[in-house]
Amino acid sequence: MKANIHPDYTDLKVTCSCGNAFTTKSTMSKDAFHIEVCSECHPFYTGKQKVVDTAGRIDKFKQKFGKFSRG
């Protein structure tokens, strides 16, 4: 392998807008990185995920455009 061709692999402090912070390794040239959503505040991980009821919307679509179906 060639020497001195790879970027430095350093610690990177990641901070979320919710206040959660953690450290990881990265080749980024920055010391810190800011994100908007993390596993502490994302609805999928917190259990506050909304389920969208699309059944009514699909029926409405079929009613409106069903006459144009190929089958």
UniProtKB/Swiss-Prot annotation:
Cofactor(s) listed: Zn(2+)
Superkingdom per UniProt: Bacteria
This protein's UniProt keywords: Metal-binding, Ribonucleoprotein, Ribosomal protein, RNA-binding, rRNA-binding, Zinc
Family membership: Belongs to the bacterial ribosomal protein bL31 family. Type A subfamily.
Subunit (UniProt): Part of the 50S ribosomal subunit.
Protein purpose: Binds the 23S rRNA.
Xref: PANTHER family: 50S RIBOSOMAL PROTEIN L31, CHLOROPLASTIC (PTHR33280), LARGE RIBOSOMAL SUBUNIT PROTEIN BL31A (PTHR33280:SF6)
Name of the protein in its database record: Large ribosomal subunit protein bL31
Native organism: Laribacter hongkongensis (strain HLHK9)
Gene: rpmE
